[in-house]
């Protein structure tokens, strides 16, 4: 088959199969229950024995195409839930971090690669809060880095305070990167 769907990758044989299939040219879709894209990569690597992990990181760096992490959040108006998505595409910078075992640096790359279609969870949560879709508390609960999220919130408050002192017209653009167009 050209495309393989692996329902849940939670053990060594399943992850080993998925990685090997991807390495041999198959398009593999799979799920891993984690809270971030970096955690997803770590989970796949860490099921292997320590002596095999460098090779697995190298295989993932070469064959991985994208990782998405999803959270459902309660809407502020209680009318249902809204999807928040973290998106990582396997660029040269990401592949290098995976290969070197520096997945803890992936959030920094996500935060600065929006124009390439990537999106960090914390920035997406802040957007949902700013647009009045979710409460600050709901967004904060799902934030990957609570301190960074709080900093984003404080920056936003400072910008709003500065604008309110200046007066005048404020125009907002709802332009979104191509990776977000299909989710709305």
Locations of regions flagged by a protein language model:
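Short, flexible helix-loop junctions that flank or precede catalytic/ligand sites
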Residues: 1-184
């Amino acid at each position: 088959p050209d495309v393989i769907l692996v329902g849940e990758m939670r053990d060594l044989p399943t992850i080993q199969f998925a990685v090997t299939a991807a390495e041999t040219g198959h398009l593999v879709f799979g799920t891993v229950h984690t809270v971030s894209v970096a955690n997803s990569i770590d989970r796949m690597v860490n099921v292997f024995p320590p002596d095999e992990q460098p090779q697995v990181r190298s295989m993932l760096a070469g064959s991985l195409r994208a990782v998405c992490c999803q959270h459902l959040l309660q809407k502020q108006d209680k009318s249902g839930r809204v999807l928040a998505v973290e998106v990582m595409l396997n660029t040269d910078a990401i592949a290098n971090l995976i290969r070197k075992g520096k997945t803890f640096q992936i959030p920094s790359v996500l935060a600065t690669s929006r124009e390439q279609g990537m999106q960090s969870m914390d920035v997406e949560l802040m957007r949902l809060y700013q647009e009045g879709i979710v409460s600050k508390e709901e967004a904060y609960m799902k934030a990957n880095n609570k301190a960074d999220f709080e900093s984003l919130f404080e920056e936003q408050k400072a910008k709003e305070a500065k604008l309110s002192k200046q007066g005048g017209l404020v125009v907002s653009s709802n332009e979104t990167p191509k990776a977000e167009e299909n989710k709305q």
